[in-house]
Structure formats: C-alpha cells, structure tokens
C-alpha cells in the first residue's frame, strides 16, 4: 500500500525515532532508572547493534522488519517488567536549553547552524559514503553480514575496503534506510542529531553533578564553542557515538553509589557495548571501566553487573572477526602476529607514510598546537582546569581523567594510520573534548571569588562561542580564509567537488569497452556505490582474486595467464592515492607478457589498460 507523501514520510520518521528511543526508554523503566533522552538513545543504539550481532551469528535475515520485531520485543519486555517503586526523577533532558538563561539565544544560534548542516550536508565525512553508509546499504541488500569483513573475491565485490570496523554505526544507518525505504543520506540526520543532543545532555548532567547548574551551563556552552567536537559528530563517522558512550560510562560510574547502583552499572555496561560498536579499539573502554569500578571499590556485585553486560557483547564482534580472518584487527598488522591482507597492508602503509612521520619535527607539534587553539580552545582550557583539579585531588575528576588519558593514547596510536593527516585525526579525540568541557565548566567555579571574576568568565565564554559559530558552520574549512558568501556551503566543499567528479567518472567508465563481464580493477572506494546501477563490477586492488598480480614467486607467464582469465583489462586509479607508484613498484606486469597503456588521465583519475600477451605459451 502506497501512502501519500504527506502521511508516508512522517510515519517513516516516527518509526525511525521510535526505534532509537522507545526500546531504551522501556529498558530504563525495567532497570528502575530515571528517564533520560541520552540513556534511552544509548540503550536503543546498543540494542540495535546487539540485534545485528545476534542475527549475524544465527543467520537471521537482517531486514527492517526483523529489526523492528527485535526492538519491539525489547520494548515490550521492558514495559511488562514489574515496577517496584518509581525512580527519583532527573532534571529534564532539555535542561541544556531551558537552563541557559541569558545565553539561550546564543545557544539556539549554535543549534540553528547544527540543524542547517544536518539538513544540507548530511554524512559530510570524506569516506562515510563508501564505508559506514555503504555497509548499511549492503547489509540490507543482502540481508546479512556474511561478506563482512571481506575475505574472498566475491566478498570484495560487495564491500571494497579490507577492514573490520564493528557495524554499530552501520546498524543505525541500516535502521534509518530501512525505515525510510530510501538510501538518501538525509535520513541519517536524526541519528546524528540525537548523538549531539544526547552528548550535550550528558555533559550537562555530569557537570551539574560535579558543580551545580552554573558549572553545567558553562560546560555545555564550552562544548558548543569547540568546533572540533561538533564536527566529529556531524561528519557521521564513529566519533560522535564514541564521545557519547564514553561520557555515558563516566556518568554512570559516578552514579554507581546512588540508589539502584547495580542498575547504573548495567547501564554503564550498555554504554561500554555502544563504545565497542564504534571501532576496533572499542572494547578497551569496557576493560578500563571495569578497572575503574574496582579501583573505586564499588561493591563486587556492581562490578560484576558491569562486566557481565559489557564483556560478552564488547568482544563478540572481534571474536567473530578473529574466527573468520585469523586476526581480530583485520585491517591492521599487529607486529606480524596475525595474518593480514598483505597487499592492502602494503598499499595502506604507502598511503599513510606521511602520517607515520607525524610528530617527527617541531613543525608537526606546532601544527598540533595551532589546530587545537584554533578549533578546540575550550578543550585546551579544560586541560588547564583538569590539571588544577587533579592537583587539588578533587575526587569527581578521577574517572574522567582516566578516560581522557585513554582517549589521548588511542588518538596518538591512530595518527600513523590516518590517511587524512594530523587535522583529520583530531576527530578521534572527541571523548576527551567532551570531558574536558566538563572539567573546564567545573574548574572555572573555583575562581568565582568576586562578581567581577564571574562577569569576566561569562564574557570570555560568550566571546568563545560567538567566535566558534562561523567555524562550526564551515569546518573543516577555515572561515578566516573564505569569503563570507562561501560559508554556507563550505562545510561540504569536498562533496561539491567529489559528486560532479563521480558522475563524470561514471560516464567515462560506462563508455569503456569492458566486455561481457563488465569488470574493472580499482582503488577507488566510492566506485562500487557510484556504479551500482551500471552493472559494472569493481574488483579492488587488494582482492585475493588478483593477489597473483603482486606475487613475486609466480612466473611472469603464469601471472599473464591468470590476468587474462580474470576478464580484467582496465584499471581506474585515484591520483590522490599512492596507487600509481604502488603498482609501478609492486605489480608483476613489467614483462614481455604484458602491454600496459594509459587510456585517460584527468586531474583526479588515471585509467590504464593492461593486456596479457595473446601468445602465452604453455603453463609453467
């Protein structure tokens, strides 16, 4: 049955939002915990991820219908659970709006910019479309994750990148696309918007617990004045959910001695699962949370509840990846301990060679300082405030400090593996930015020794937020280097370049004489999605199907024979990548059995044609 758009779209939107909030709301009821928008969203997100894991392990079809049934069962179970006494209510989840007092117009201006970017620039991260979003589309298309992480040649034609990022964010996007019946990126904006709103709620709640409403107000304003934090959420990758989950863990641990302490620890465990769903290193947050619970000398039953919830589902995905690939961190070479996709590892190392040299010179450290001062000044203030609080042995900051240090360590380890460079790597620090905003909001309260000091602090925060608004609008661009007339579209400048280029490339590739099999070899992550309607199969450079091309142990004649049998001829290379040099130095086709010619070269793409000699001779 087809409903009119005016009815159909709102109903689909309501279903989407209901799946993101209702299961979590009912779970809070069953746990006898007060309702919170952030907690409801975190629980629902974790439940969706766990549902996808269960479906994957059991072979159940991943579809919007089955996901809705599973979420409905969770919601129903929470609703019928016996209720023994009402939990003490929390302040409104929208206190970050209602409690802003004179700052409310400025805070609303911040959210106006956020909503504008969510509507006009959804999923603006440079690789979201062919990783997180595309994985969501593919899991719905095939009804499973059997192809992920990709291992065989056929797997790599379904998902190009050789990685094993947990499908937490992809599960959320699959829910959005399934509810919408559309792959339009705009349908993911409610998810991203809820991440940021929930993050601000938890920043408010944590700072309020530490230092009252004034500290909460300052902390949220400082978070809004940190463009890098907002950008880390808006790009639609994993860093928004990581920040939300980590702040949620800290909040729950600090509530563990309250009434229903075990329920708070169960909620902390669910936050750990949400954190583990974001990235390969995610399970470390569960381990550190359990250690914190033990160091804080929380009751053994409380720590047991945390571990019972957090550990199994945090480790479920890496365990599956390990079973399938022999390496729990499939895209990483962990000291040669685990097997890897050798071609992808060598290719990515050449891609990351500049990032691997980060911090090798004073200029790198100066660039880091400049980036943080320009785009995350409240976090820099937060570092000073945190040091002050730690030296004063303020106990509220202990757990937050541990997770800030952990986040910085994870970021430092990730820089060498970030193709986007130092600035792009700073999105990984999103949990630290959020917690440092709390530390700054609380720490500033210690200098409130006069009315003049209070006024100066208020003026400084106002100035920070006003100055940050243009940056929030245009990041990753610099508003000081752009004409005002370009600000509105600057945040998606890469998209404005990539989309027309992708359309042009699609037309070029479609015109190539590809033969009956219609296959090309490429390193371009966006091509499988861009060419999905053209019936052209993309074989990635690192697919096991073409591993022979880089095998020095094979004889040239055998390599040529296999190339001809592969029905591949054209190679499409992104000039922004190191693939051209990589092929020159690694591909074993510089022999008399191959003829390699350049078919076309543009500003962004190189197209080669490799033909095996028709006279291959006998197989050797």
Would you name each region that the model predicts?
Residues 496-543, 569-576:
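Short periplasmic/luminal acceptor-recognition loop of GT-C membrane glycosyltransferases, typified by
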Residues 121, 295, 302-381, 471:
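Membrane-lumen/periplasm interface segments of specific transmembrane helices
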Residues 111, 217-225, 270-272, 288, ...:
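Transmembrane alpha-helix segments characteristic
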């Amino acid at each position: 049955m087809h409903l009119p758009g005016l009815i159909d779209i709102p109903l689909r939107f309501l279903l989407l939002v209901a799946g993101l909030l209702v299961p979590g709301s009912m779970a809070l009821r069953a746990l006898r915990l007060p309702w919170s928008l952030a907690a409801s969203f975190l629980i629902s997100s974790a439940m969706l991820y766990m549902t996808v894991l269960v479906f994957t392990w059991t072979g159940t079809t991943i579809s919007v219908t089955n996901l809705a049934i599973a979420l409905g069962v969770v919601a129903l179970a929470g609703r019928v659970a016996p209720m023994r006494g009402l939990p003490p209510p929390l302040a409104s989840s929208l206190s970050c709006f209602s409690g802003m007092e004179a700052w409310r117009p400025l805070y609303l201006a911040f959210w106006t910019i956020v909503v504008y970017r969510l509507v006009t620039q959804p999923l603006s991260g440079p690789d979201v479309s062919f990783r997180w979003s595309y994985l969501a589309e593919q899991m719905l298309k095939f009804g499973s994750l059997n192809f992920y992480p990709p291992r065989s040649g056929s797997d790599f034609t379904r998902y190009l990148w050789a990685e094993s990022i947990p499908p937490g964010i992809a599960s959320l996007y699959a829910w959005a696309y399934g509810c919408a019946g559309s792959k339009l990126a705009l349908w993911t904006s409610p998810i991203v918007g809820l991440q940021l709103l929930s993050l601000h709620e938890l920043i408010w709640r944590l700072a309020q617990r530490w230092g009252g409403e004034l500290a909460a107000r300052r902390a949220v304003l400082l978070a809004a004045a940190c463009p890098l934090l907002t950008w880390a959420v808006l790009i639609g990758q994993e860093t928004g959910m990581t920040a939300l989950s980590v702040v949620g863990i800290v909040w729950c641990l600090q509530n563990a001695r309250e009434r229903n302490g075990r329920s708070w620890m169960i909620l902390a465990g669910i936050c750990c699962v949400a954190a583990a769903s974001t990235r390969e290193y995610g399970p470390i947050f569960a381990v550190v949370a359990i250690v914190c619970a033990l160091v804080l000398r929380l009751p053994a039953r409380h720590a047991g509840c945390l571990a019972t919830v957090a550990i199994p589902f945090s480790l479920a995905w890496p365990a599956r990846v390990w079973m399938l690939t022999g390496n729990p961190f499939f895209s990483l070479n962990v000291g040669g301990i685990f097997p890897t996709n050798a071609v992808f590892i060598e290719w990515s190392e050449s891609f990351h060679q500049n990032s691997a040299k980060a911090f090798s010179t004073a200029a790198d450290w100066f660039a880091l300082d400049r980036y943080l001062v320009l785009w995350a000044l409240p976090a820099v203030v937060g570092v000073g405030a945190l040091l002050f609080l730690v030296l004063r042995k303020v106990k509220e900051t202990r757990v937050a400090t541990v997770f800030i240090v952990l986040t910085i360590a994870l970021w430092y380890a990730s820089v060498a593996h970030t193709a986007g460079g130092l600035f792009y790597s700073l999105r990984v620090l999103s949990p630290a930015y959020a917690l440092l905003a709390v530390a700054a909001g609380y720490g500033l309260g210690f200098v409130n020794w006069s009315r003049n000091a209070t006024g100066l602090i208020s003026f400084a925060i106002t100035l920070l937020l006003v100055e940050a608004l243009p940056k929030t609008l245009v990041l990753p661009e610099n508003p000081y280097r752009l004409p005002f007339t370009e600000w509105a579209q600057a945040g998606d400048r890469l998209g404005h370049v990539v989309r027309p280029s992708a359309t042009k490339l699609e037309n070029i590739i479609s015109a190539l004489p590809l033969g009956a099999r219609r296959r090309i070899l490429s390193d371009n992550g966006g091509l499988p999605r861009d060419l999905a309607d053209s019936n052209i199969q993309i074989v990635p450079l690192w697919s096991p199907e073409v591993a022979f091309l880089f095998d020095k142990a094979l004889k040239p004649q055998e390599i040529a024979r296999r190339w001809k049998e592969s029905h591949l001829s054209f190679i499409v290379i992104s000039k922004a990548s190191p693939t051209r040099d990589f092929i020159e130095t690694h591909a074993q086709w510089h022999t008399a059995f191959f003829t390699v010619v350049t078919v076309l070269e543009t500003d962004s793409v190189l197209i080669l044609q490799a033909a095996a000699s028709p006279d291959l001779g006998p197989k050797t």
